[in-house]
Design a protein with these regions (language model features):
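Glycine/proline-rich, positively charged
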Residues: 13-111, 117-125, 129, 147
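Secondary-structure boundary/capping positions in well-ordered alpha/beta enzyme cores
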Residues: 2-3, 34, 96, 166
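Short internal beta-strands
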Residues: 7-9
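Structured C-terminal cap/extension of enzyme domains
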Residues: 111-283
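N-terminal binding-site loop/beta-alpha segment at the start of enzyme catalytic domains
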Residues: 1-5, 283
């Protein structure tokens, strides 16, 4: 074992704790490690996932036994849930850290960050490069607006300047993919002014493209996806349109649009395709 390495794995909750433990054993075996430093209960996205985890004789009781045996260090949870459920899970006081989504283009989990900080929890940001806007393949407009930094560097530094955030997840298909993130880390102490300038530039570009009246009101009074005919996720569709209009984030918007209707509780609701068949505009 490498003392400089912190090893994390994720196991989803299960209605049958014995199945949860089997998956935990499988993960441990594949990692070929004597101890898991961090275990995340993966995907507390719905109230029933939380219940499976924390109820008496639930999945967390298995974890506590493993912790007592010295096989697991800290336990957290990962989530794509709405912010109220994230906060409810945080405030159980049963978890040491949380893996969630929060980055420049998506900050609606701000209240969850506040709750995690108040409960002295670690915060791990999920996929800030990919889910933060396909920053590995940025638009020319985004590249220009983020200059002299690359959009990946800007987003990394935007997140890490917030003292409530401790870790960013980084995917790499080749070792060189890590270089730009290491470059961002090397600039943490010198780029505060640049980050502020880029942030203002991005916001100004969005106001220029969309207008102040739209940007200050677009998300007010919108129905939830499960309150809408065809389960169309109107808030997400409008958000994606904002990203497209403001910063030319076409590849990301298309990817997220295509996932709606196929993402289940990880990315709930449907896109607007059903307007062409089963749902009328009058509905």
């Amino acid at each position: 074992d490498d003392p400089k390495r912190i090893l994390q794995t994720k196991v989803p909750p299960n209605n049958d704790p014995s199945i949860f433990e089997q998956e935990l054993e499988l993960s441990m075996s594949r990692l070929n490690s004597k101890k898991i430093d961090l275990l995340a209960i993966h995907g507390i996205n719905l109230p029933e996932h939380l219940d499976m985890t924390i109820r008496p004789n639930g999945c967390l009781q298995i974890v506590r036994r493993w912790q007592k045996d010295g096989l697991i260090g800290h336990v957290g949870f990962s989530t794509h849930a709405n912010v109220d459920l994230i906060i409810k899970t945080i405030e159980t006081g049963l978890f040491d850290y949380v893996n969630l989504h929060w980055y420049f283009i998506r900050q609606e989990n701000e209240r969850a960050l506040q709750a995690a900080d108040a409960n002295d929890m670690g915060v791990f940001i999920i996929s800030p490069t990919d889910k933060g806007g396909h920053l590995h393949t940025p638009s020319l407009k985004l590249l220009d607006l983020c200059s002299p930094l690359h959009p990946i560097e800007f987003n990394d530094l935007f997140c890490l300047r917030d003292k409530r955030i401790h870790t960013l997840s980084v995917g790499a298909s080749i070792p060189e993919d890590l270089d730009i993130h290491l470059s961002a880390i090397s600039k943490m102490d010198t780029m505060h002014g640049v980050i502020n300038t880029i942030e203002k530039r991005l916001i100004n570009a969005s106001y220029k493209s969309l207008g102040e009246s739209w940007l200050t009101t677009w998300n007010i009074g919108l129905p939830r996806w499960d309150q809408t005919p065809g389960e169309i996720n109107i808030p997400t569709l409008l958000w994606l349109n904002n990203l497209l209009e403001a910063w030319d984030m076409e590849s990301f918007a298309k990817d997220r649009y295509g996932l709606l209707g196929r993402g289940g509780h990880w990315f709930p609701g449907a896109n607007a395709d059903c307007l062409d068949c089963e749902v009328s505009e009058d509905d």
